[in-house]
Amino acid sequence: MEEPPEEKPKVIGGPYNFWLYSPVSGYDITHPKSVSAPKVYPRLTCKTGSTHLTLAPNRTALVVVDMQNYFLSPALHRPPNSAGLQIAEKLKNVVIPACRKKKIPILWLNWGLTPLDILAMPPTVKRGFALDNNFVHGYKAPKLGVDVGPVQLEGGFTIDGGRVLMRDTWNEEIYDPLAALVVRGTDMKVYKNRLSGFTADTETDKALKSRGIRTLIFAGCNTDQCVAATLMDAAWLNYDCILLSDATATTSPKFAQEAVEYNMEGLDFKMTCKDLVNGQRVAGDVDF
């Protein structure tokens, strides 16, 4: 007995920006030219919750938020067994290799300040950094732009740590074990000067649009702060957003992570690292 044909997919959105949904195949967020246009290839189908999600890998980017030496390195008195370091290991061993294999571009989104940024920084941001207590050995959070002095790394050698989160300093750089994975000339790196990476004077939106990116997969820390702020702004700028739930972490209480994950159920999408790794990529003629 032949299976009944799949019903016509439901259109969610408008004529120029829409998803297609079918109870059988789940959500299609590949963004063909029109509802009646041929399917977009290549395409990648992943599990998300109780349904499936199909995206266009070359219109998608992994956004890695704030995985920087300042926030992660034990050399700066950060905890040696932090949730952020566990996320770094997962990115190194699972997520980034999966994105390379599936040909999903990567954008590294980092705090990177200029002297003008320090002068213009609002009290709310300065206060937030001053309240950071995710340090060991009684170390107190230095102010933005303050020189952290010499830093002793593994192996016993010492480097200049630089001023806190100022551009082109060691503490601002991508966390050392992850920096080794950056592909120069292929990966994107963008500086931000607020929790969100989409403020008016950042290059995030421009960098993504120049690559034709429509869908963003978020990883990094802190989930309820910089990740969530960037994700929400991205959604309002018409990007499709996916939270990689077990590749994000926060120093906040557990309920803060849970709240962001809960909100993603109604905003856009959530998936796990395993869902991404197991995603099925189908090649074909690309419809742009």
Where would I find each of the regions flagged by the language model?
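Glycine-rich, phosphate-binding/catalytic loops in enzymes
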Residues: 79-83, 124-125, 235-236
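A short alpha/beta connector and helix-capping loop motif
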Residues: 58, 75-111
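Short, conserved beta-strand edge motifs with alternating hydrophobic and charged residues
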Residues: 64, 107-110, 190-191
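Active-site-adjacent betaalpha module
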Residues: 1-61, 68, 93, 101-102, ...
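Short catalytic/ligand-binding loop motif for oxyanion handling, primarily in non-cytosolic enzymes
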Residues: 115-118
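Serine-centered coil/turn micro-motif
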Residues: 74-76, 124-125, 169
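Short acidic, Gly/Ser-rich segments with clustered Asp/Glu that frequently serve as metal-coordination loops
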Residues: 68-74
